[in-house]
Regions:
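Alpha-helical transmembrane segments and their short interhelical loops
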Residues: 113-114, 118-185, 233-245, 250-252
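Hydrophobic/aromatic residues in alpha-helical transmembrane segments
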Residues: 53-58, 83-90, 134, 166-167, ...
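Transmembrane helix segments
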Residues: 58, 62-64, 174-215, 219
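Hydrophobic alpha-helical transmembrane segments of multi-pass membrane transport/permease proteins
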Residues: 38-64, 71-87, 188-193, 246-247
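Aromatic- and glycine-rich beta-strand/loop motifs that create alpha-glucan
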Residues: 2-50
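Hydrophobic alpha-helical transmembrane segments of multi-pass membrane transport proteins
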Residues: 50-53, 57, 70-142
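Membrane-interfacial helix-loop-helix junctions in multi-pass membrane proteins
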Residues: 146, 194-250, 262
Length: 263
């Protein structure tokens, strides 16, 4: 959908009425999906490389793992695949919109800012599905394990995906320079891969670093996902949900603060 038809469609109905909000949301969703379709294969490939790829590589480093260790690797793979989607690709897409001028165009539309944010977060959640499914399929096939999938898998994946995308969107709005955002996200991925207890127990970290991860979201992403895929490997899942909820809210507040300043 091009810029002119999008603006015309949004102008056709007041966004103050519930039906207008829904129509504007659907139009924005269609616009986002069509404009980002060239990124979809890249996003899925990146998820698989960092999710299943890292789980498989870790297995080469430690070839004789007990069953619990293998389950840690496999159940941590989805978190590794969701982090780059929300915290790298989302800021990169926003930076691309700034460069192309699409970002300012979207801000100028007569539609509530919350609708634009909701559309972006919805697209990210939809993109995450094939990457996470492929990551889990490859990891379980490689190690030959059977997961104990519970109904909690739905809220776990929804919250982790929403949190990662919300934080990434907040970062992209707070930092206006796309080059700085790119630098920050690359450093973030480096730190996550090397210094986050996602694919192994946090108890293997020094006490001070383990304490740091109590407040960061990465460890808690792995906890809620692992709890929904296995039994007996995680404890205190409620705290992890609270931490992820707090980071999600922080991302929304960051976006809202930037919106209020811009007007």
């Amino acid at each position: 959908m091009s810029a002119q038809p999008l603006a015309a469609t949004l102008l056709g109905r007041s966004p103050r009425r519930p039906a207008g909000w829904l129509r504007a949301y659907l139009v924005m969703l269609r616009f986002d999906l069509s404009s980002q379709r060239t990124w979809l294969p890249f996003a899925v490939a990146m998820q698989i490389l960092l999710g299943a790829g890292m789980a498989i590589i870790y297995g080469f480093y430690v070839p004789h793992l007990p069953r619990a260790g293998i389950l840690y690797l496999v159940s941590g793979a989805p978190a590794l695949s969701l982090i780059p989607l929300g915290m790298v690709i989302v800021p990169a897409l926003t930076g691309q919109q700034r460069t192309a001028g699409t970002f300012d165009f979207l801000w100028s539309l007569p539609v509530a800012r919350g609708i634009q944010v909701a559309s972006t977060l919805t697209v990210c959640s939809l993109i995450a599905v094939p990457g996470v499914v492929a990551t889990l399929a490859l990891a379980t096939w490689r190690y030959g394990v059977t997961l104990s999938i519970s109904p909690a898998v739905i809220p776990a994946f929804l919250l982790t995906s929403l949190m990662a995308s919300s934080v990434g969107l907040g970062l992209a709005h707070l930092v206006r320079n796309p080059m700085v955002v790119n630098l920050v996200t690359n450093i973030l991925i480096f730190l996550v891969l090397l210094y986050s207890p996602i694919s192994f127990p946090r108890s293997q970290f020094p006490t001070w670093l383990a304490d740091v991860h109590e407040g960061l979201p990465f460890y808690h992403m792995a906890v809620v996902i692992r709890a929904s895929l296995t039994t007996g490997l995680t404890t205190d899942v409620g705290t992890s949900y609270l931490v992820l909820g707090a980071w999600t809210l922080a991302g929304w507040l960051a976006v809202g603060w930037v919106m209020s300043r811009r007007g």
